[in-house]
Amino acid sequence: MNAEKSPVNHNVDHEEIAKFEAVASHWWDLEGEFKPLHRINPLRLGYIAERAGGLFGKKVLDVGCGGGILAESMAREGATVTGLDMGFEPLQVAKLHALESGIQVDYVQETVEEHAAKHAGQYDVVTCMEMLEHVPDPQSVVRACAQLVKPGGDVFFSTLNRNGKSWLMAVVGAEYILRMVPKGTHDVKKFIKPAELLGWVVQTSLKERHMTGLHYNPITNTFKLGPGVDVNYMLHTQNK
């Protein structure tokens, strides 16, 4: 397990990285800034494992892994996991937590484009959760993910739809009213409509397999997957 450094390429937003660097030490605080990620992780993991036909014995790449919440959980399922992120502090937190947990994850600090140039076609599963809305060129990330997965392999994306409801729910509600995430975490202008994401996907070797919404109920304080992609959504694609 390591946390290598590498040169930065064009597709990096240093202000976005700084946001997560500032709160990296709280990544594994179940009641802290990343509480929502811990809450939705079982749903994400279950969706990925089910759609990919299980994770045991598979080689998996988690793009934009942050502090390693999803990466660790996939490793616990028996996958060989590499976590990729451009934030140095989140990767250090991820590396330390994996050591404390006895979980083997290989953490690398480089962009997905750089990784794709060296490791094309090497992964059974690639995940890219809540990362596309934090980079200048999300289409470039989609292309790189397509290059990294093996023929017949699975690629999963999750992001936020761009509309009035998602602004109210993800920005006004989550950041300012419920204070579920730090203020300034999201910029609605960077949210991605499903049609836009699918438009990028069809320009690669990937094919859409399934899409689902991720829904939060503030009354019951619960999350669930289901129809409706007007706020958070997940997309399963497969390499042709």
Swiss-Prot record:
Reaction equation(s) it catalyzes: a 3-demethylubiquinol + S-adenosyl-L-methionine = a ubiquinol + S-adenosyl-L-homocysteine + H(+); a 3-(all-trans-polyprenyl)benzene-1,2-diol + S-adenosyl-L-methionine = a 2-methoxy-6-(all-trans-polyprenyl)phenol + S-adenosyl-L-homocysteine + H(+)
Presence of the UniProt keyword Flavoprotein in the record: no
Binding site for S-adenosyl-L-methionine: 44, 64, 85, 129
Disulfide partners: none
Coiled coil ranges: none
Protein's UniProt keywords contain Methyltransferase: yes
Pfam families listed in its UniProt record: Methyltransf_23
Pathway(s) per entry: Cofactor biosynthesis; ubiquinone biosynthesis
GO-annotated molecular function: 2-polyprenyl-6-hydroxyphenol methylase activity; 3-demethylubiquinol 3-O-methyltransferase activity; polyprenyldihydroxybenzoate methyltransferase activity
Keyword annotations of the record: Methyltransferase, S-adenosyl-L-methionine, Transferase, Ubiquinone biosynthesis
Highest taxon in the source lineage: Bacteria
EC number(s) per entry: 2.1.1.222, 2.1.1.64
GO BP terms: methylation
Record-stated family: Belongs to the methyltransferase superfamily. UbiG/COQ3 family.
HAMAP family (alphabetical): UbiG
Record-linked NCBIfam families: UbiG
Its job: O-methyltransferase that catalyzes the 2 O-methylation steps in the ubiquinone biosynthetic pathway.
Protein name: Ubiquinone biosynthesis O-methyltransferase
